[in-house]
């Protein structure tokens, strides 16, 4: 990447859905979780540009070339009494890493958060991705080691939604 050309960041448009989808697939491949990336272009269009969008995306370009992206949504912190931004995905093409693309995406996200009165910017990182963790700490982010992320998907989510749980002591476990 030429040193005199910095990344340009802009919101994704509906016509960018194929580019966003391509980045999602590349991120899944990088994380060795391609099988989990079942998203389609129609899913991207509905989530980002449908009648009730649930997320937004930013694209980073170097010249005319897509260099990276971020997908994010707004959250709410009851403790702070303020909204926040959760960054679902952040990915930079390998050849553009180390050239300010990721930082430019995060700066843009922080600016959007400031404009909307957000009190925080949060994201998760795979625990083996030391390069990313070092980058995040270099910009001032702090790992939240006292928190553990839980997730319900598929059959477990369906069971809970249908009310099929039993109470055991102080914890709730799904029926088997």
Question: What residues fall within each predicted segment?
Answer:
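Conserved GNAT acetyl-CoA-binding A-motif
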Residues: 114-124
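A short beta-loop-alpha structural element at the N-terminal edge
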Residues: 8-20
